[in-house]
């Protein structure tokens, strides 16, 4: 027996030595790694919480099926050649006597897709899942076609050996246009062969793509786990992938506002035995210079940097540096560019995205994740959204806004793991980080979390309280507050918002949850960042007769429009209202335009089937043909929307319009542009809602009656409407889901996409567009009826009762003008005008004070006791500085 073993090992050694390309070889270093969650710079673990390094081994912690660790720095190429791999395997959990558990190597995963997409191959079989070559718990080798449910190229169940340690040796070599797979399983101490097998005639297209380790607990026992060490990959078919080169550094986000740079680097969950120091370096005179040092913050695994008095006039290259020690000390770098503040540009371009899913439906009518059964990896994994990101970069944005749901706790790509929520969040957050890394490392970014980011379906934060103990699911959500601990919520906010300018009022809320509402100034566009979930009241306890379930009133006899309008419900809360009041009148730092960003629209722009009590039917609704109209819908009354509370909504919109500010949001999945109405239609500002980037909840807008005051070319669902809560809104454009033949069809037919907002410094015009997910700006167009072009002044479109004199200014360019009602002292509105003339309009009779000046120079003139007239032509006011 030993002689046969020696001959077999020699034969395999000869095969593995043929035509080696040394620089492509891989050898794991887990034997040199400190204990911890992170599996190392070369690999991606599915899932993050399912693996760790312990006692010099890579150990699987999960007893779920088909846990994988993909090798990201090497791939199996499509060229003809040899592939060799070997690994030492140990049983880490209970020994399985059913033969259902197995461990081994997955080859050819995601052969026709990007290696990052392929790295999500785990748990389920399906198209693109590769070939699983492994050793079952009874000592039988197999070669399984993991693209099919239960098909094996080779599997002879002849052994019944309760092994605890084995060495798996794999050799794949070409033969007459196909490939032959040879596998040995050896006792690592005695070199006795446990089993051997060969499969020939494997199609060459199956031996390309990713390679990964597999710990498979099986579907029967579910108690067996495996550990690995000494993994090697080599051969002429292996190619090095240099794009996965940041190691522990995942991404960075930054803002540069009012000469303050704030940058947050996101790290993998590095071990406590690794370094705690992260360094930010800047390129000065063609040399890298240390600019700041930060410590790894846990459990967010972030490093936060701040530099005051930043030179905003130049582009500056930077890199984040982090050292780890394995065989030797190696420094990893994450590179990016701090763009200069675009005060010199006539157009400030903003991108807005929200609600990203890393997968789409596996098939029509099925909305499960990767862990929901058969999964077509080659068509249903949208991560890392390569075409989308490449097209986004073509816009050359000055600022990018991510409006929330960067993470979906369920089915993106897997169901929520509430036993390990911190690592489950990071696992899904890292997918977002990697997707947008090319943007976020080199463009200022505003990122804010929404309900799904903090593991809620809907969220009424109620001032940051905890949900009542003992409640779960929608019952907990309806009660108000946060289901997850404050530490978890703060971790999420740290990963997503710690690079934002300092909060306007930093005091924590409720259970110690931090806040992030603030102002960010980019090129003179002042952006108010607000939180429209954290302070919002929960409706269920306020309306006991409504029978509210997950934010939807189930009592059909309860009149939502009239009964839901009360004065003791909050939307933004008093602290944010105070901030917005102060922000609306602050035009310093040459601010010439204002915008508000938040999670969701301040209206309920959606319809549902007439007989439905809530939106549970939305994922099941048939996607209509393009141009067709869905009949039989009613207006939605979703308390999760910011159509409620109406008083809080109106209060906020009155402040927005005082600053002539546009509103930019996400959340609803339904791309739209509306103009708000408060007392009358179209008397407040415009809003644009981005389509979902990845949509599993395709809301639509098919009201049961036509809108009024429509343009001739507008369809019936455009124009003036009151939503289900009685809020006035005018629909200018909406992107309903519709049938389409552009691949991936199951993604694009849901009208997924993104928004662009272009602010014009010279004209003060604003161009709003919603684009399809697949759109290339160099050859494609936005969705129909976009772009919508407005002027800054259109955001305060009340009908005036009178006019103040025209103001003509000399000695000052583009001054700021404030109109103050003397009886109340309230600033009616303020703005930085373009040029030197402006005629104010007012909306009530009485005396007004006009202030004209430049806040950056603290030069002001005031004219009091100015009374409006009903005619425009009157003696102008000449102001000289």
PLM region spans:
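Flexible glycan-contacting loops in extracellular carbohydrate-active proteins
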Residues: 192-226
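Bacterial Sec-dependent N-terminal signal peptides
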Residues: 1-21
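Carbohydrate-binding surfaces in secreted/extracellular proteins
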Residues: 85-87, 159-198, 766
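Short, aromatic/His-centered strand-loop micro-motif at the edge of beta-sheets
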Residues: 141-169
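Short carbohydrate-recognition loop motifs
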Residues: 49-68
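Secretory/extracellular carbohydrate-interaction modules
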Residues: 62-147
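Extracellular carbohydrate-recognition regions
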Residues: 20-47
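Long, structured stretches of catalytic cores involved in phosphate-ester chemistry, encompassing
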Residues: 56, 220-238, 258, 267, ...
């Amino acid at each position: 027996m030993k002689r046969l073993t020696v001959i077999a090992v020699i034969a395999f050694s000869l095969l593995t030595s043929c035509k080696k390309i040394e620089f492509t070889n891989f050898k794991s270093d887990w034997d040199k790694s400190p204990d911890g969650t992170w599996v190392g710079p070369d690999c991606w673990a599915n899932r993050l919480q399912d693996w760790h390094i312990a006692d010099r081994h890579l150990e699987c912690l999960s007893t779920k099926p088909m846990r994988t660790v993909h090798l990201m720095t090497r791939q199996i190429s499509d060229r003809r050649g040899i592939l060799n791999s070997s690994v030492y395997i140990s049983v880490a959990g209970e020994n399985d006597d059913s033969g259902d558990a197995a461990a081994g190597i997955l080859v050819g995963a995601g052969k026709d897709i990007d290696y990052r997409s392929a790295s999500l191959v785990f748990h389920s079989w399906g198209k693109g899942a590769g070939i699983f070559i492994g050793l079952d718990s009874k000592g039988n080798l197999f070669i399984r076609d993991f693209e099919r449910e239960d098909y094996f190229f080779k599997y002879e169940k002849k052994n019944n050996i309760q092994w605890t340690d084995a060495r798996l040796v794999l050799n794949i070599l070409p033969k007459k246009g196909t490939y032959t797979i040879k596998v040995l399983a050896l006792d690592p101490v005695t070199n006795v062969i446990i089993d051997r097998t060969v499969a020939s005639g494997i199609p060459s297209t199956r031996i390309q793509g990713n390679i990964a380790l597999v710990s498979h607990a099986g579907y029967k026992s579910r108690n067996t786990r495996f550990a690995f060490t000494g993994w090697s990959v080599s051969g002429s078919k292996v190619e090095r992938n240099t794009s996965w080169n940041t190691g522990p550094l995942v991404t960075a986000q930054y803002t540069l506002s009012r000469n303050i740079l704030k940058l947050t680097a996101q790290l993998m969950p590095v071990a406590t035995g690794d370094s705690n120091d992260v360094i930010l370096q800047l390129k000065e005179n063609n040399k890298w210079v240390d600019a700041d040092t930060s410590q790894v913050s846990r459990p967010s695994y972030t490093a936060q940097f701040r530099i005051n008095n930043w030179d905003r006039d130049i582009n500056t290259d930077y890199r984040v540096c982090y050292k780890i020690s394995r065989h030797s000390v190696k420094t990893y770098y994450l590179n990016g560019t701090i763009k200069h503040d675009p005060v010199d540009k006539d157009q400030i371009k903003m991108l807005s995205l929200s609600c990203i899913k890393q997968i789409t439906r596996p098939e029509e009518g099925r909305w499960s994740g990767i862990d929901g059964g058969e999964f077509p990896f080659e068509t249903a994994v949208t991560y890392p959204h390569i075409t989308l990101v490449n097209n986004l970069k073509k816009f050359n944005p000055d600022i990018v806004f991510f409006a929330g749901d960067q993470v979906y706790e369920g089915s993106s790509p897997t169901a929520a793991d509430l036993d390990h929520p911190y690592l489950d969040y990071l696992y899904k957050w890292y997918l977002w980080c990697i997707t947008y890394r090319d943007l976020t490392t080199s463009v200022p970014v505003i990122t804010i979390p929404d309900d799904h980011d903090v593991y809620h379906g809907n969220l009424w934060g109620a001032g940051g309280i905890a949900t009542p103990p003992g409640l779960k699911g929608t019952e907990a959500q309806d009660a108000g507050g946060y289901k997850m601990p404050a530490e978890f919520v703060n971790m999420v906010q740290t990963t997503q918002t710690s690079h934002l300018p300092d909060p306007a009022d930093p005091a924590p809320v409720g259970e110690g949850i931090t806040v992030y509402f603030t102002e960010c100034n980019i090129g003179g566009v002042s952006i108010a960042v607000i939180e429209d979930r954290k302070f919002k009241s929960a409706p269920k306890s306020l309306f006991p007769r409504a029978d509210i379930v997950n934010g939807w009133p189930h009592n059909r006899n309860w009149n939502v429009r009239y009964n839901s309008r009360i004065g003791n419900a909050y939307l933004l809360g008093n602290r944010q209202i105070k901030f917005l009041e102060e922000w609306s009148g602050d035009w310093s730092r040459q601010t010439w335009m204002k915008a508000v960003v938040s999670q969701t629209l301040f209206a309920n722009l959606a319809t549902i089937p007439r007989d439905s009590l809530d939106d549970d039917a939305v994922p099941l609704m048939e996607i209509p043909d393009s141009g067709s109209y869905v009949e039989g819908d009613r207006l939605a009354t979703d308390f999760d929307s910011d159509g409620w509370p109406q008083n809080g909504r109106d209060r906020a919109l009155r402040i927005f319009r005082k600053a002539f500010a546009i509103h930019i949001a996400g959340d609803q999945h339904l791309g739209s542009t509306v103009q708000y109405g408060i007392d009358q239609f179209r008397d407040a500002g415009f809003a644009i809602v981005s389509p979902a980037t990845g949509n599993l909840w395709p809301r639509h807008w098919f009201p049961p009656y036509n809108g009024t005051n429509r343009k001739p070319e507008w369809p019936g669902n455009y124009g003036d409407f009151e939503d289900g809560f009685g809020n006035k809104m005018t629909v200018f454009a909406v992107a309903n889901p519709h049938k389409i033949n552009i691949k991936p069809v199951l993604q694009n037919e849901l009208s997924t996409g993104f928004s662009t907002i272009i602010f014009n410094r010279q004209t003060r015009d604003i161009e709003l567009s919603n684009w399809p997910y697949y759109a290339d700006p160099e050859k494609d167009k936005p969705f129909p009826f976009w772009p919508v072009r407005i002027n800054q002044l259109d955001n305060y479109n009340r009908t005036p009762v009178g006019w103040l004199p025209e103001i003509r200014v000399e000695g000052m360019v583009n001054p700021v003008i404030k109109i103050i009602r003397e009886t109340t002292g309230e600033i009616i509105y303020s703005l930085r005008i373009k040029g030197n003339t402006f005629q104010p309009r007012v909306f009530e009779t009485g005396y007004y004070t006009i202030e004209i000046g430049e806040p950056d120079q603290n030069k002001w003139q005031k004219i009091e006791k100015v009374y409006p007239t009903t005619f425009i032509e009157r003696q102008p006011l000449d102001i000289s500085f």
